[in-house]
Amino acid sequence: LTSLGIQESSRVAAAIFLIHILTLSLLILLGAFFVFFNGLDVLLSNFRLPTEGSLPRALLFGFAAAMLGISGFESSANFVEEQAEGVFPKTLRNMWIAVTIFNPGIAFLALALVPIPEVAQHQQTLLAHMGNLAGGPWLSVLISIDATLVLSGAVLTSFVGVTGLVRRMTL
């Protein structure tokens, strides 16, 4: 990456990643406090609602939707040749650990904080709405800013990935 002049971009991407992890951790922590102090009434009422179709179908669709939210796996493969021996498997492991912790945690909190009928009203800004419920307007704003940064990081990652792809195709 340094030879391509993208060293600064990798620092920006690392900063965006750190901010994102801290924001998600804060959402989970404050959401857990909210549920602890306000009870599980919303969660239990959400679990009582009937599912459309079967439970396996609901789990499949939920898993598929969660996979759409995972970014970075496809881009990290572009850097295999530039990484030291054994780094790429560690990178994948670390990404899977983060996804395994954050995705189920946030999904559980969504069920515990937001009544299902209310989800449709906030489908474009559900995490920000969860932040507003759990921590107030300041957390909602922080989550919105974080979302903007993450989208910017995705564009940056795509640029780096395309650059690697073009380099391999021209060799």
What is each of the regions a protein language model found here?
Residues 163-171:
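Juxtamembrane helix-loop transition segments at the membrane interface in multi-pass membrane proteins
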Residues 1-4, 23-34, 105-109, 150-153:
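Residue-level signal for alpha-helical transmembrane segments in multi-pass membrane proteins
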Residues 49-94, 142-155:
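Hydrophobic, membrane-embedded alpha-helices of multi-pass small-molecule transporters
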Residues 3, 66-74, 99, 103-108, ...:
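Transmembrane alpha-helical segments of multi-pass membrane transport proteins and ion-pumping complexes
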Residues 14-72, 78, 101, 111-125, ...:
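Helix-loop-helix junctions that connect adjacent transmembrane segments
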Residues 91-153:
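TM-loop-TM module centered on a large, flexible mid-protein loop between adjacent transmembrane helices
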Residues 4-11, 52-55, 87-90, 131-141:
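Juxtamembrane loop-transmembrane helix junctions in multi-pass integral membrane proteins
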Residues 1-19, 78-82:
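Membrane-water interface regions at transmembrane-helix termini and the short interhelical loops
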